[in-house]
UniProtKB/Swiss-Prot annotation:
Membrane-related topology note: Multi-pass membrane protein
Something else known: Partially overlaps ALT2. Disruption phenotypes caused by deletion of this gene may also be a result of a defect in its overlapping gene.
Chief location category: membrane
Cysteine pairs bridged by disulfides in the record: none
Keywords for the protein's UniProt record, in alphabetical order: Membrane, Transmembrane, Transmembrane helix
GO CC annotation: membrane
Keyword Cell membrane: no
Disruption phenotype: Displays increased levels of spontaneous RAD52 foci in proliferating diploid cells.
Protein name: Putative uncharacterized membrane protein IRC2
Keyword Membrane: yes
Bilayer-spanning residue ranges: 21-43, 58-80
Subcellular location: Membrane
Gene: IRC2
Length: 102
């Protein structure tokens, strides 16, 4: 089971799959590299894969590049969405990510 969060043009969509659904619906594109190659030309935006069972919430953070959608996992580990076009990770101070969990 995993969560897929895609942000495109300021709108974020979340998709949550259990093991049975993902194996039937995503057969053939399960590898992250293959799936990224499929998503990139369509959404031209952000992609993140999270393990199941982790608490997470998304928020927008401003960077010198543009606004990036990031994810806080378990309110203890800061993990940002990878930008498929710009090939960089958005970041924020750990204290800032901690305050968002309070």
């Amino acid at each position: 089971m995993f969560a897929l969060i895609i942000s495109s043009k300021g709108k974020t969509s979340g998709f949550f799959f259990n093991s049975s659904f993902s194996s039937s619906a995503l057969v053939g594109i399960a590898p992250l590299t293959a799936y990224s190659a499929l998503v990139t030309p369509v959404f031209k935006s952000f992609l993140v894969i999270l393990p199941a069972g982790l608490k997470s919430k998304s928020f927008a953070v401003n960077t010198p590049f543009k606004s990036c959608w990031c994810v806080i996992v378990m309110c203890s580990y800061f993990f940002c969405v990878y930008h498929l076009q710009k090939q960089h990770y958005c970041g924020a101070p750990s204290l800032y990510s901690y305050l968002l969990c309070l």
